[in-house]
Amino acid sequence: AEKACELIEVEYEVLPWAIEIDDAIKPDAPILHDHIQFDGKPSNIAGTLEHKKGDINKGFSEADVIIEREFKTEAVHQGYLETHSCLVSVAADGRATIWSSSQGQFMVRAMTSFITGIPQSSIRAIPAEIGGGFGGKTIVYLEPVATILSKKSGRPVKMVMTREEVMRASGPTSGSKSKVKIGAKNDGKITAAQGTFYLQAGAFPGAPIRGAAGCCLAPYEIPNAHTFGYDVVSNRSKVAAYRAPGAPIGAYAVECVLDEVAEALKMCPLEFRLKNLIKFHKIRLKSLPHE
């Protein structure tokens, strides 16, 4: 099979592309999907998420110290030791059995059924013990392909990605571009916080903006806050989960700014955080009680 693949010659028509977030959101950026609209026109911004609490302008006007910083993080792969692999056998009666290196059988069964057209009731998915996943194996790549090949050939089919194929074709976590602004009074109380987060989705929508915009301020009681997340498509592999998807991006930016605010106030960073720690049953930014 590998020798046969080497004989295939592919001719590509090279089109304009956008790799980085800044390239994808600029006014003259090449549009990946015409049906994706933002502000009434085709755009690479596939979705947004906004959280508000209090009066952000009033909060900053009350602050004695204000720190604003921008951050950029690159896409990072989960780096699991075992590559994606599966073994699929489709019997004469059309019932399929899938053994795969995955993080869940229900997802494998549902997605394989959706792609192949085989009813879920005719698919048995067996997740094997895996050599690491960290969120990167909560999606299927090989299972539907192996299922179709097994059905056509009448024989079991085994597929294993090479390390190069994993890095080229499977989903890493999002790269990001963020801006965070935090204000506090001289006594150490935070009066306002604002965060804007652009996350790479890859070629199709689905960046974990909820984790970045929704969780970045979760540990703290802040009377005036505003966060905004942008789901940005670009010419990259579709992203996948990676250990609390999106949350480290938001937390990293916020915590870095908190360190600078504490330094400007000449406070211990730990004491500064404890002073602003949210209490049980207080309302978080997402209008939910902290429990």
What are these regions (language model features)?
Residues 1-291:
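Structural alpha/beta core scaffold segments of enzyme domains
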